[in-house]
């Protein structure tokens, strides 16, 4: 990820964070925060479904720009969700950096081992 990409995510996250205490009648993000966990999480599910459908459309000759737009919507709502749970893009970036260089199989095995250790097993 380039520094400018990370900066974009962090700037957007800062705007989203600033909406936490905002007027739900004046801000879509404030409205989502005000509605609580279920509304935020439902929106993630809706946007993820739209990404899947747009990806399938691309395979059928649909516009790739539609897929990009849907992924942007999903990423935006993921940023809202992270903020709602007092997390930030930096937390996700740190986790991706931690995983970098590990195969998916290695990462999954390490995660399972860590979970067993945390659960006393």
UniProtKB/Swiss-Prot annotation:
A GO biological process held by the record: L-histidine biosynthetic process
Catalytic activity: 1-(5-phospho-beta-D-ribosyl)-ATP + H2O = 1-(5-phospho-beta-D-ribosyl)-5'-AMP + diphosphate + H(+)
InterPro entries: HisE (IPR008179), PRib-ATP_PPHydrolase-like (IPR021130)
Entry's localization field: Cytoplasm
Claim: Transmembrane is one of the keywords in the record: no
GO cellular component: cytoplasm
Pathway the protein contributes to: Amino-acid biosynthesis; L-histidine biosynthesis; L-histidine from 5-phospho-alpha-D-ribose 1-diphosphate: step 2/9
EC number(s) on file: 3.6.1.31
Disulfide bond entries: none
Keyword annotations from UniProtKB, A to Z: Amino-acid biosynthesis, ATP-binding, Cytoplasm, Histidine biosynthesis, Hydrolase, Nucleotide-binding
Keyword Acyltransferase (UniProt): no
Molecular function GO terms recorded: ATP binding; phosphoribosyl-ATP diphosphatase activity
Domain of life: Bacteria
Transmembrane segments: none
Assigned protein family: Belongs to the PRA-PH family.
Protein name: Phosphoribosyl-ATP pyrophosphatase
Organism: Burkholderia orbicola (strain MC0-3)
